[in-house]
């Protein structure tokens, strides 16, 4: 086997192992935050939404700087430092008994993600051939779903002992991942040239096509982040037990493991990337409207299943399209900036969603936040349609590869 092909093959397997552990460590802790602080301790959903939004905004909003630094110094030191920072965030979360401590823990967790997420994403572009990326992103999403279920199951089981134990287990997992990267990850350069930090940043900022695409996705992410805030709260409220949240993630895992890869293989040969993204977002948006009027667990889980189906269709296309638009001379910077939509959407989706949830309950209108989210989804869909039709992306980039 040629040396480069061998490096790609080994790198692919390491990326899969690394991703599985990162997802596991994240989902041991984060799905239980809203249950712990809102349902068990009685905090306002807005306070917890601010904490989750802060983590999202720091991790994704500052990602361009993490990516630019990785372009300059390489992936390995950034990834290791980021993993250790996230572990420290979980340690602070274990002792959080006031909102400011929860906010600090989420900020540290987000800062860690700022450092490790863009170089890890750029390594996928470096090591996976363009024609294989769509399917590889589907494999990563399948891993995400399986890891989410295993993590949520483990976290729910540990929660019966104490939330501190949940946080410490999450911290240990990220320390383990840092050790594996220190031991096994080669000192890869993620860009084709050693790009100065400022040049990488400016290259992205001048790319108006990429900027518009990233910012338009803010509305998409406002819907997507509710799997960590309002959906777990709804499941817990209707079922009456935190352990029911695991069924939500089990549904995601079953759908992803059985349908995600076949749908990606089938659709990439028949539809352009932007078509797949918009169809998925349409399904996600439609599923939002009835959730607030649901009073039984089975219909709620059916609507959540519909939401996940939309995500399964949209997410591989979104990730592949972002990678296709990245300039190879500044991959880290591009992948860092591509998270800005997630930063804005996450911050608004978490804090705004928490506020709408509290307001809806205070006004005895529990359907209010879900109606607003569905409306935002359709507005985003209209903006994407306008963008893809008024400012055409090159056909080569919109193919399935």
UniProtKB/Swiss-Prot annotation:
One MF annotation (Gene Ontology) recorded for this entry: transmembrane transporter activity
Entry GO terms, CC: plasma membrane
Disulphide bond pairs: none
Keyword vocabulary terms for this entry: Cell inner membrane, Cell membrane, Membrane, Transmembrane, Transmembrane helix, Transport
Protein localization: Cell inner membrane
InterPro entries: MFS (IPR011701), MFS_dom (IPR020846), MFS_trans_sf (IPR036259), MFS_Transporters (IPR050171), Multidrug-R_MdtH (IPR022855)
Pfam families on file: MFS_1
Domain of life: Bacteria
SUPFAM superfamilies given in the database record: MFS general substrate transporter (SSF103473)
Main localization category: membrane
Membrane-spanning ranges: 13-33, 34-54, 99-116, 139-159, 165-185, 214-234, 244-264, 277-297, 300-322, 340-360, 368-388
Topology of the protein relative to the lipid bilayer: Multi-pass membrane protein
NCBIfam families linked: PRK11646.1
Protein family according to the UniProt entry: Belongs to the major facilitator superfamily. DHA1 family. MdtH (TC 2.A.1.2.21) subfamily.
Protein name from the UniProt record: Multidrug resistance protein MdtH
Source organism (scientific name): Pectobacterium atrosepticum (strain SCRI 1043 / ATCC BAA-672)
